Design a protein with these regions (language model features):
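A short, structured beta-strand/loop element
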Residues: 2-45
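Long, charge-rich, low-complexity alpha-helical segments
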Residues: 28-73
Length: 73
């Protein structure tokens, strides 16, 4: 399980986007990144398709997810 509260690139607000984790300052769900990557999109395409999301945010989310997955249990 990924510990999203410790990732500075994301936020969650029960009043927005059904309380989903989103990229900070946007309404773009973090899940959209992983869904698009799974479908074969490039990070550069994702950032182009979702102008409010920065490449730095995407990198931070991917780094955070990787660290969470690789962390010892």
């Amino acid at each position: 399980m990924i510990d999203w509260p410790t990732c500075p690139a994301v936020e969650r607000d029960p009043e927005r986007v059904s309380d989903a984790w989103v990229f900070r300052g946007t309404r773009v769900p973090v899940a959209a990144l992983f869904e698009n990557l799974e479908d074969g999109a490039l990070v550069s395409q994702f950032v182009e398709w979702f102008p409010g999301v920065t490449i730095e945010q995407v990198r931070a989310v991917l780094d955070h997810a990787a660290r969470s997955v690789l962390a010892p249990a």
